[in-house]
């Protein structure tokens, strides 16, 4: 696109728009469990611990991580940690999800699953902005901007 606008809805009664981001390097509090990481934004928004744990378990299950809910972050593989943080990013039902290299530390099968999950978020009204070098992720995107050459997918500068 050569021009246009981006608007981020600000739901009434909330201070901040629902924007979540997931960084390439899966940093977390090493001693805290996977479920603690996913529940954190829910607790910060005032959800009870019991409710937050139910929702966090649902999200962990969606990423095939329910069996790791109580495992400390330090004991997760790089791919598991990345998926925990993706689940955390989705915990507060963001309208905009910013993701940096979401498949960089994953095996091919898991990377395909993550790409599919990210692609399906648009059906839920979530806009996803992805920074990636992965051609399979790029192929699933509605629009691609090649920052290396400052061109969009049609070659326009």
Go through the PLM ranges and name each one.
Residues 32-43:
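Q-loop/switch helix immediately C-terminal to the Walker
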Residues 50-68:
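Conserved ABC ATPase "signature" region
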Residues 72-76, 80:
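Conserved ABC ATPase signature
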Residues 86:
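Hydrophobic anchor residue at the start of the ABC signature
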Residues 89-90:
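ABC ATPase C-loop
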Residues 93:
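Conserved catalytic motifs of ABC-family nucleotide-binding domains
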Residues 97-100:
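Catalytic Walker B motif of ABC-type/P-loop ATPase nucleotide-binding domains
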Residues 107:
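ABC-family nucleotide-binding domains
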């Amino acid at each position: 696109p050569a021009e246009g606008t981006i608007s981020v809805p600000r739901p009434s009664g909330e201070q901040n728009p629902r924007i979540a981001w997931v960084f390439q390097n899966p940093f977390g509090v090493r001693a805290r469990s996977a479920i603690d990481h996913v529940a954190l934004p829910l607790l910060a928004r005032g959800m009870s611990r019991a409710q937050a744990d139910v929702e966090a378990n649902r999200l962990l299950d969606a990423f095939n991580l329910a069996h790791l809910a109580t495992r400390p972050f330090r004991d997760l593989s790089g791919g598991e940690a990345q998926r925990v943080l993706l689940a955390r990013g989705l915990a507060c039902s963001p309208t905009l999800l910013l993701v940096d290299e979401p498949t960089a530390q994953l095996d091919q099968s898991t990377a395909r699953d993550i790409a599919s999950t990210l692609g399906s978020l648009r059906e839920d009204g979530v806009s996803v902005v992805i920074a990636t070098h992965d051609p399979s992720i790029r192929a699933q995107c509605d629009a691609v901007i090649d920052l290396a050459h400052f061109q969009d997918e049609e070659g326009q500068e």
